Amino acid sequence: MRNVMIVVEYDGTNYHGWQYQKNAVTVQEVLQKAIKKVTGEEVNLIGASRTDTGVHALYQVANFKTNTKIPAEKLPYALNSVLPDDIVVVQAKDVEDSFHARYSAKRKRYKYIILNRKFQMPTMRNYCWHISYPLNIEEMKKAASYLIGTHDFSAFKASGSSKTSTIRTVYDLTIEKNEDFINIEIEANGFLYNMVRIIVGTLSYVGLGKIKEDEVYDILKSKDRTKAGITAPPQGLYLIKIIY
């Protein structure tokens, strides 16, 4: 039996996240059905990151066990011929049997896009968070620096998380302005439930002057979710890299 790894890009707008749900359409379910059409096999597709409803992926990694004889390099063509236009397999390769898309991952990187201008941009409404008041980028950058390193991120975790440990290491957190857009990228060894979106929401409060930049350190140390900012909406979030 082979262990096949695939790299997937998707527009999360029309999906209830990655993970299979009984009464909703998810990315995992659509991909598993496509694999069955192509190989004739029911597979258990393991994703590196269980993205939420409306969240996008420019680099999602998944793996599945299969007996198919289709060469790995032909699989993307076969799968894309039966997949909808908003899910694309860009790479497939055979990997060792022990490879697990989720548990073998060492780091994950996300990008969050904010549109910071007076009016919404209709063509981007499903792909960014519109904030109409000007954000102070320099203050946001100062606040972000407190979050780099190994910390207890309980203050940036939504309720409903099944993870027991709340300690995570953030290796990189950058904020760049590109005309009307603000791009926030964060890389860590793992993320708690809604952690990226709560960090973005908190940094937006700093940018708006609702929270002082040095208060972010106090919020982090408090381990109290109620002290942090709002949870940023899902449509601005992109999974952009999995590092093994």
From Swiss-Prot:
The active site is at 52 (nucleophile). It comes from the Bacteria. Its EC number is 5.4.99.12. Keywords: Isomerase, tRNA processing. One of its GO terms (molecular function) is tRNA pseudouridine(38-40) synthase activity. It catalyses: uridine(38/39/40) in tRNA = pseudouridine(38/39/40) in tRNA. Transmembrane segments: none annotated. GO terms for biological process: tRNA pseudouridine synthesis. Pfam families: PseudoU_synth_1 (PF01416). PANTHER family: PSEUDOURIDYLATE SYNTHASE (PTHR11142), TRNA PSEUDOURIDINE SYNTHASE-LIKE 1 (PTHR11142:SF0). Homodimer. Belongs to the tRNA pseudouridine synthase TruA family. HAMAP family: TruA. Formation of pseudouridine at positions 38, 39 and 40 in the anticodon stem and loop of transfer RNAs. This is tRNA pseudouridine synthase A. It comes from Thermoanaerobacter pseudethanolicus (strain ATCC 33223 / 39E) (Clostridium thermohydrosulfuricum). The gene is truA.
